[in-house]
Swiss-Prot record:
Note: Methanophenazine seems to mediate electron transfer from F(420)H(2) dehydrogenase to the dihydromethanophenazine:CoB--CoM heterodisulfide reductase.
Originating organism: Methanosarcina thermophila (strain ATCC 43570 / DSM 1825 / OCM 12 / VKM B-1830 / TM-1)
The name this protein goes by in its record: Dihydromethanophenazine:CoB--CoM heterodisulfide reductase subunit E
Taxonomic classification: Archaea, Methanobacteriati, Methanobacteriota, Stenosarchaea group, Methanomicrobia
GO biological process: methanogenesis
Molecular functions (GO terms): CoB--CoM heterodisulfide reductase activity; metal ion binding
Length: 264
């Protein structure tokens, strides 16, 4: 296997993880995610109306039935007369989150930073994967995966900091804004802490490897296990864990907004 197809992650410098091994880990995370989504859609299809709520007694849900019903609601005319065009909902309500902006400017900034950072980093990872896969199956590209990874380093840093700022705002709000602090439970802190850990571990892994900013004088030999730790917890909490936690709201809220035509 070429040098470009060996990752920074590994148990040690001599035991680096390979593309195939990373794809196996990714596939496991995706299977766990899909299984959780099927269970969640079945619950929604049988009448469950919120996170951690069970279906109506005696009803067996169907993910396909739920999706058909949801699509029918999306495409039919709103009976309440408040329906907005789908494109407007996608851009203003889902992408730019104007509903949150109407309620709180600081909360909106926090959500936008976390959303933009998280989703862009996810998209950049997808781009990196597509280049590596293309290279692996033998399709010629005008650049190597290693070159492409270096090109992505700056946007990865930029959107990593965007995500970090958003998470720090979330932490500050829960510490110093009384109504937010009083409404927070330990589970909310765990979810924020997980995103913070994923973000910081990424900076640390890169800093130890490059010796820039985030290395904190740590031994460079720690770079592979640090990168492996970041990769594993990213797959676990940013993909696999979503349907089993309150992270599901990043899927549930857009679905509800589209089904309600932007209505409350």
């Amino acid at each position: 296997m070429s040098e470009e197809m060996v990752y920074f992650s590994g148990l040690s410098d001599a035991l680096r993880i390979t593309f195939v091994q990373m794809m196996i880990l990714s596939a496991i995370a995706i299977v766990i995610f899909l299984y959780g989504m099927i269970i969640t859609l079945q619950k929604w299809g049988s009448g469950a109306t919120g996170y951690a709520l069970e279906p109506q007694e005696g009803k067996r849900g169907s993910a396909i039935t739920f999706l058909k019903t949801w699509w029918k609601q999306v495409t039919e005319k709103s009976p309440h007369g408040h329906g907005k065009p789908i494109l407007e909902i996608l851009i203003l309500d889902i992408l730019f989150q104007r509903r949150i902006l109407k309620r709180s400017g600081l909360r909106w900034v926090m959500h936008i930073l976390i959303f933009a950072g998280w989703m862009t980093l996810f998209a950049l990872s997808g781009l990196m994967f597509s280049v590596e896969l293309t290279h692996m199956i033998g399709i010629e590209l005008p650049f190597t995966p290693h070159m492409f990874r270096e090109w992505l380093s700056i946007p990865n840093y930029i959107f990593g900091y965007i995500l970090l700022i958003g998470v720090l705002i979330a932490i500050v709000r829960r510490l110093f804004v009384s109504e937010v602090r009083e409404a927070s439970i330990m589970y909310d802190w765990v979810l924020i802490g997980v995103v913070f850990l994923v973000t910081i571990s990424g900076f640390l892994a890169d800093g130890i490897r490059t010796g820039l900013i985030w290395d904190f004088g740590l031994d460079p030999s720690l770079a592979p296990p640090a990168a492996l730790f970041h990769s594993v917890i990213s797959l676990l909490f940013c993909i696999a864990f979503i349907p089993y936690s309150k992270y599901i709201h990043i899927i549930a809220i857009p679905l509800a907004l589209l089904a309600n035509k932007g209505g409350e």
